[in-house]
Amino acid sequence: MKLKINSQGLKGRLKVPGDKSISHRSIMFGSIAKGKTVIYDILRGEDVLSTIEAFRAMGVEIEDKGEVITVHGKGISELKAPEKALDMGNSGTSTRLLSGILAGLPFETTLFGDDSLSKRPMDRVATPLQLMGAEITGQTDKVKLPMTIKGSTHLKAIDYVLPVASAQVKSAVIFAALQAEGLTKVVEKEKTRSHTEEMLVQFGGELKVSDKTILVPGGQKLVGQKVVVPGDISSAAFWLVAALVVENSELILENVGVNETRTGIIEVIQAMGGQLEILEQDNVAKAATLKVKASQLKGTEISGDLIPRLIDELPIIALLATQAQGQTIIRDAAELKVKETDRIAVVANALNSMGAKIQPTDDGMIIQGGTKLHAPENSINTLGDHRIGMMAAIAALLVKNGEIELERAEAIQTSYPSFFDDLEQLSENI
């Protein structure tokens, strides 16, 4: 795909697609609950479709009527063994969270995925589930896909300290804990996104959260609910950054999810001097309308507890930092190396090819700001990573002459199928 975007500024209002994390979890909770779950504004990306197809393969009736998805749950004990291995596509969320559910079911299931997902570490989720009594095997000593899970109907509760900041691993343990005998204790070193905990309560479940400790009693029964999915702040991030760095831009983004464990990017933008206003905020739905306009920005440091609250936004934040005055340092973000790609290396290579000055480090990047971007000599390959593709498309807005050749742009379908339509709406034709 060739990107040549002659933007004189981005203008308009936009409702970004539904939150990917909440969309996955709404299908999962609806499938293990008893009764009907009705989901509005779900994300229709490839990752979420992988979750839907997995539960259909286990006997769950899931109706898709366009604007509304209805899940007819019969309870977790009614899930059936799938007739064949489950295809997780590119979805790490589907794989890891589903593993927690499968750990307590009386059958054996094999999960497989695409080349990118098959390289990602699954031992981090296999280890606690094995401690609880599930049998999990992969193709190597370090568990990766394809992975086979033989569940146990006698899972035992555990006390588990998460070795890495991972909402996916935490969620897998919580899903398994619902089926375990006793009280499971999960301790986070750094707080990660809290959607699983909040949705468990919404579906009639019970848990106690105290700072970074979560207590989950076993043997719980859940009840179907109505779920309205807010817009995904990780998708909104691309437009927030675009409006900040493209001259004469002003955007209003409606119904953006602002769960406090996900709003690190808002704090970074404010720390960098960006003009960002929260116009309307619904504290119950945890959603807000955001107004953002082109701004003079300054460098900052991003590290520590902030990292899990913006881990998925770091690629586009790196682009933002190239346009700020001064130096931006990102550290404590080694987790970027085991995303869909090694995002430290891939982001640095892509933006440096356009004239940025980014030094990759073991756990982040050092970015010199105030650089003008130009068209790269060679194409930029997403390597199947949706966030790299969208970052490159936003970077193209800053290229005055020439165009960007983007390879494997279809990866963007993973999380934002309407991305290029929205880009066209907010700027000029691609």
From Swiss-Prot:
UniProt-listed Enzyme Commission number(s): 2.5.1.19
GO biological process: amino acid biosynthetic process; aromatic amino acid family biosynthetic process; chorismate biosynthetic process
Sites where the protein binds phosphoenolpyruvate: 20, 92, 120, 168, 343, 387
Pathway given in the UniProt record: Metabolic intermediate biosynthesis; chorismate biosynthesis; chorismate from D-erythrose 4-phosphate and phosphoenolpyruvate: step 6/7
Localization per record: Cytoplasm
Alphabetical list of Pfam families matching this protein: EPSP_synthase
CDD domains assigned to the protein according to its UniProt record, in alphabetical order: EPSP_synthase
Active-site residues, as the UniProt record annotates them: 312
Catalytic activity, reaction form: 3-phosphoshikimate + phosphoenolpyruvate = 5-O-(1-carboxyvinyl)-3-phosphoshikimate + phosphate
Keyword terms: Amino-acid biosynthesis, Aromatic amino acid biosynthesis, Cytoplasm, Transferase
Main location: cytoplasm
InterPro entries: Enolpyruvate_Tfrase_dom, Enolpyruvate_Tfrase_sf, EPSP_synthase, EPSP_synthase_CS, RNA3'P_cycl/enolpyr_Trfase_a/b
GO cellular component: cytoplasm
Residues that coordinate or bind 3-phosphoshikimate: 20-21, 25, 166, 168, 312, 339
GO molecular function: 3-phosphoshikimate 1-carboxyvinyltransferase activity
PANTHER family assigned to the protein according to its UniProt record, in alphabetical order: AROM/DEHYDROQUINATE SYNTHASE, PENTAFUNCTIONAL AROM POLYPEPTIDE
Function: Catalyzes the transfer of the enolpyruvyl moiety of phosphoenolpyruvate (PEP) to the 5-hydroxyl of shikimate-3-phosphate (S3P) to produce enolpyruvyl shikimate-3-phosphate and inorganic phosphate.
Subunit organization: Monomer.
Family: Belongs to the EPSP synthase family.
Name this polypeptide is given: 3-phosphoshikimate 1-carboxyvinyltransferase
Species lineage: Bacteria, Bacillati, Bacillota, Bacilli, Lactobacillales
Encoding gene per record: aroA
